[in-house]
UniProtKB/Swiss-Prot annotation:
Residues carrying Phosphoserine: S18, S353, S411, S452
Assigned protein family: Belongs to the herpesviridae tegument protein VP16 protein family.
Name of the protein this chain belongs to: Tegument protein VP16
First-listed, main subcellular location of the protein, grouped into a coarse class: virion
SUPFAM superfamilies per record: Conserved core of transcriptional regulatory protein vp16
Keywords in alphabetical order: DNA-binding, Host nucleus, Host-virus interaction, Phosphoprotein, Transcription, Transcription regulation, Virion, Virion tegument
Signal peptide positions on this chain: none
Lineage: Viruses, Duplodnaviria, Heunggongvirae, Peploviricota, Herviviricetes
Residues that span the membrane, as ranges: none
């Protein structure tokens, strides 16, 4: 079973993220399927950023950020977000308070100049896998503890996100410093050239105009890929570790019914429950099988665990279906930028004077020349009051369980990278099976173990059955699930 779990996550991440740790071998029966996250596994390894970048053109600076993060797929993923209508990000906390003192994000060019001239890049090692002070929860012994498990896993995610975001904020400051110094050097060169041609221009005015024209646009571009890396990689690490535990305890989820407050809770990147086999509803309305397949299509492309529900999935239907893009509806990229802008606008919103606050609240009095980090139609949507995003987050799902005797099991095995049967390879090498085929013709009567039972043998003896270890039954159930067998002998 250990080898099966190891193979399950062998090629989890195509973007360079470490796969979840394997299930520990030789431990006690109540050992969780995966060790506590960041305890001794590969996910605990730090990811240190290189030294701060030098002033280079924005395009080169952007490529440097991708290289430092090991996130070459970042631009393609940003483009992919523009092809989906799902709201993947509104359920995530903005942590806008972390940016209230980030002067480099001010929408006043004079503030950026003052900050850039005084800022010294952080040269100490920056670990973008910093950890919070909340322990990774393990699955409860009984299903009655699933509610507390959901809350504990959410607290762990929020703590890890906040701890990491502080490191990502420092990385963004270093790159914004390099961007500012490049723009300042470019403006100084243009100023010297203009002076040599007899056209005296104010250097400060030229610098502020350049910042207004290029700094905010390039900063938003850097922030977009930086925070996508933060959300995507952290969610992958936590959910795949939780998935490794949950798939080993189907008894906890066979009767689980989950009623969500909003669809955003299910569409969001972070979904603590990957198996809800009893019933999956939003305010009492069952989730359509097509909607779940479309959502799982997105999660599959983002390399996140699929959300499985025996009550929702249609027997024989594929687990994923490409969603249809509706051009007149909000897109995932727009929701993502709303989340990013909440961070980038935090400093200016926090330091705004009362008169400026009035202008911000009244669209007719806004200055057309005011600097900003871009806009999206998602930021202009008039959401109903019961579905409006809140910083405090949505209410926890309402959990219940099916009555005894109504257990539901998945009819389709979870997608894995494990090959069974003729496609099985051992240690990456082709093994000749000709000698093993000879076992099919082997006569077991030669060993004295024919069809006739020996003396003293009682059919269906209960003593040997009761002596079996519970781990044997867990492995047998996992093996039949992997083969897609609903009933023994199916």
């Amino acid at each position: 079973m250990d080898l099966l779990v190891d193979e399950l996550f062998a090629d989890m991440d195509a973007d360079g993220a470490s796969p979840p740790p394997p299930r520990p071998a030789g431990g006690p029966k109540n050992t969780p399927a995966a060790p506590p996250l960041y305890a001794t596994g590969r996910l605990s390894q730090a990811q240190l950023m290189p030294s701060p970048p030098m002033p280079v053109p924005p395009a080169a600076l952007f490529n440097r950020l991708l290289d430092d993060l090991g996130f070459s797929a970042g631009p393609a993923l940003c483009t992919m977000l523009d092809t989906w209508n799902e709201d993947l990000f509104s359920a995530l906390p903005t942590n806008a308070d972390l940016y209230r003192e980030c002067k480099f994000l001010s929408t006043l060019p004079s503030d950026v100049v003052e900050w850039g001239d005084a800022y010294v890049p952080e040269r100490a090692q920056i670990d973008i896998r910093a950890h919070g002070d909340v322990a990774f929860p393990t699955l409860p012994a009984t299903r009655d503890g699933l509610g507390l498990y959901y809350e504990a896993l959410s607290r762990f995610f929020h703590a890890e996100l906040r701890a990491r975001e502080e490191s990502y904020r420092t990385v963004l400051a270093n790159f914004c410093s390099a961007l500012y110094r490049y723009l300042r050097a470019s403006v100084r060169q243009l100023h010297r050239q203009a002076h040599m041609r007899g056209r005296d221009r104010d250097l400060g005015e030229m610098l502020r105009a350049t910042i207004a024209d290029r700094y905010y646009r390039e900063t938003a571009r850097l922030a977009r890929v930086l925070f996508l890396h933060l959300y995507l990689f952290l969610t992958r690490e936590i959910l795949w570790a939780a998935y490794a535990e949950q798939m080993m305890r189907p008894d906890l989820f066979d009767c689980l019914c989950c009623d969500l407050e909003s669809w955003r809770q299910l569409a969001g990147l972070f979904q603590p429950f990957m198996f809800v086999n009893g019933a999956l509803t939003v305010r009492g309305v069952p989730i359509e099988a097509r909607r779940l397949r479309e959502l799982n299509h997105i999660r599959e492309h983002l390399n996140l665990p699929l959300v499985r529900s025996a009550a929702t999935e249609e027997p024989g239907a594929p687990l994923t279906t490409p969603p249809t893009l509706h051009g007149n509806q909000a897109r995932a990229s727009g929701y993502f930028m709303v989340l990013i802008r909440a961070k980038l606008d935090s400093y200016s919103s926090f330091t705004t004077s009362p008169s400026e606050a009035v202008m911000r609240e009244h669209a007719y009095s806004r200055a057309r020349t005011k600097n900003n980090y871009g806009s999206t139609i998602e930021g202009l949507l008039d959401l109903p009051d019961d579905d409006a995003p809140e910083e405090a987050g949505l209410a926890a799902p309402r959990l219940s369980f099916l009555p005894a005797g109504h257990t539901r099991r998945l009819s389709t095995a979870p997608p894995t990278d494990v090959s069974l049967g003729d496609e099985l390879h051992l240690d990456g090498e082709d093994v000749a099976m000709a000698h093993a085929d000879a076992l099919d013709d082997f006569d077991l009567d030669m060993l004295g173990d024919g069809d006739s039972p020996g003396p003293g043998f009682t059919p269906h003896d209960s003593a040997p059955y009761g002596a079996l270890d519970m781990a044997d039954f867990e492995f047998e159930q996992m093996f039949t699930d992997a083969l897609g067998i609903d009933e023994y002998g199916g």
